[in-house]
Regions:
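Acidic/histidine-enriched, glycine/proline-rich intrinsically disordered or flexible terminal extensions
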Residues: 164-208
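Internal, conserved structured core segments that host functional sites
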Residues: 54, 58, 89-92, 119-125
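A short beta-loop-alpha structural element at the N-terminal edge
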Residues: 7-19
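Conserved glycine-rich acetyl-CoA-binding loop
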Residues: 63, 81, 94-105, 117, ...
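Active-site rim helix/loop that mediates acceptor-substrate recognition in acyltransferases
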Residues: 20, 27-69, 74
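Conserved active-site alpha-helix within GNAT-family acetyltransferase domains
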Residues: 116-119, 126-150
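Conserved acetyl-CoA-binding loop-helix of GNAT-fold acetyltransferases
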Residues: 88, 93, 99-112, 124
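A conserved beta-turn-beta hairpin within the catalytic core of GNAT-like acetyltransferases
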Residues: 73-88, 98
Length: 208
């Protein structure tokens, strides 16, 4: 995709380090002191659930300003079925370009590509004020419960195929790849040490 000075394209191996650094800058001290998202991204590239066809970067005038990855996931239905869907994230925008519409533009483009690949629905945890603008609704209104918090208003879902979730009642668990930092904290710390030092701060509004 190219619009004005913006290009959205697939990530290449040559982008890896720059994308990891962008992700680190985007999430640093946002949800917790420091961040983990850049390591999650780093590890997911070798995970079978990773969708390389939906691994996008965004450039503005040749400068890398955004990234998003997609991951295969599923709904565990109450009737025993497992319904394949997808999730995405991390999705990050460089701090200097946040709140200017680039994140939504990247998200909407990538969701259209996910739809073209046959994804029937996307499930995420996030802010309805942002994701609602791209068609997401609380998943519990569609019969899908978040395993960690069944009544969560922040667990969101969007049908990419109309009617895909009709008749479905079930539970969604975050894919295991999102827990690499907790499972191997030493490897995460070693990875973090390869980046420039940044101060970890405890700030109001963080989740942990």
């Amino acid at each position: 995709m190219s619009e004005k000075n913006i290009i959205i394209r697939l990530e290449t191996k040559d982008d890896y380090r720059a994308v990891e650094n962008l992700t680190r800058e985007s999430f640093w001290n946002v949800y917790r002191p420091g961040c983990m998202e850049h390591y999650v991204l780093h590890c997911y590239r070798d995970d079978p659930a990773f969708v390389p066809e939906l691994d996008f970067v965004m450039e503005l005038d040749g400068e890398l300003i955004g990234q998003v990855i997609y991951v295969r996931s599923e709904i565990d239905c109450d009737d025993g079925r497992k319904v394949p869907i997808m999730t995405f994230g991390p999705i990050g925008i460089a701090p200097a370009y946040k709140r200017q519409g680039y994140g939504k533009q990247l998200l909407d483009y990538s969701m259209e590509k996910a739809k073209e690949m046959g994804a029937g629905a996307l499930a995420i945890t996030g802010n309805i004020d942002f994701y609602g603008k791209s068609g997401f609704v609380p998943a519990k209104t569609k019969g899908v419960r978040y395993a960690d918090d069944p009544e969560a208003d922040y667990f969101l879902i969007r049908e990419l195929t109309p009617g895909f979730l009709d008749g479905i009642s079930g539970t969604y668990k975050d894919p295991e790849g999102y827990f690499v930092c907790e499972k191997n904290p030493e490897a995460f710390e070693q990875f973090e040490e390869t980046f420039p030092k940044k101060e970890k701060l405890k700030l109001l509004g963080q989740l942990c």
